[in-house]
Amino acid sequence: MTQAVKHLEEYDTQTRYQATVVSSERISSEASSDEIRELVLEVDDPGTTFELLQSVGVLAPGSPEFGNEHHFRLYSVAGLPEPEKSGRPRIEIAVKRMTYIDPYSGEEYKGIASNYLCDLKAGDTVTMTGPYGIVFELPEERDANLIMIGSGTGIAPFRAFVKHIYRDVKDWEGKIWLFYGAKSGLEMFYMNEKRDDFAQYYDEETFQAFKALSPRPNWADPIAWDRAIAERGEELWNMLGDPKTYVYVAGMEKMRDELDGVFAVLAGSKEKWLRRKAELMAGGRWVELLY
């Protein structure tokens, strides 16, 4: 496993292909202000192969007048539906419709790639690149403990990861802990009243899922990682000291500082936590996919 940080401009986007939208389904609650969609895409090139947890690039139309012919963004391969008779591969990606507020003018701007993808309909085509390497690799030890911490669309790769383990790895013995953070239950997807893709694993002895919610979502309070993690603090800290424990983090970049603060309390000091985290990272046992 590697921990190298790679920036978008470093990805090779020269090899491109077309994909057709098979379906676009809203998977966030209708009552939620967040719109998150699951897109099934059929790739026109039968020779292109994909694996779960790889990333694919999407080239949304840019602004040529500003020198940006395309707007490039990465999305995790969240699922691999069975191909139809054509033999063309199909992939699933999860997309959250994003908006941004300019801190100076207060003006709202739409995320280019996310709004482009969320507006696509069945039959539309999209230009893609990749696939790119797997960020979260499964350890060779079947008794390894896996701690997955995700927020927002960061849950998508973990859905694929957990599915792969319980479908394809029959002798998994280690603990699998999933921490899912959101402002409220309405903002959770793949784990809400409309659709809970993790429900099939709740009876597995090795699997546990924990929700970390904001105490006051309407007041923009941050996700309460401290509550969800502190409730299992002693056992979690002991797991982090086990050389067979691997931690995977996916979501918004601000999670890094939020989690560092929580784990510093768990460790007893910021310095002690940063030493432990450095050890985990050096051993490839702390891996982040942040955007």
Label each PLM-derived region with a short phrase.
Residues 6-17, 32, 169-291:
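Reductase modules of NAD(P)H-dependent flavoproteins
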Residues 21-24, 77:
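Conserved hydrophobic positions within beta-strands
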Residues 26-30, 82-85:
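Short, conserved beta-turn/loop elements at beta-strand boundaries and strand-helix junctions
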Residues 42-147, 164, 289-291:
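FAD-binding FR-type
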Residues 53, 154, 252:
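Short, conserved phosphate/pyrophosphate- and ester-handling motifs at nucleotide-, phospho-/glycolipid
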Residues 62, 97, 152, 182-184, ...:
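Residue-level signal for short, function-critical loop segments
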Residues 138, 158-160, 258-261:
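Short glycine-/acidic-enriched loop or helix-start segments at secondary-structure transitions
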Residues 145-166, 183, 255:
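Active-site beta-strand/loop microenvironment that shapes enzyme catalytic pockets
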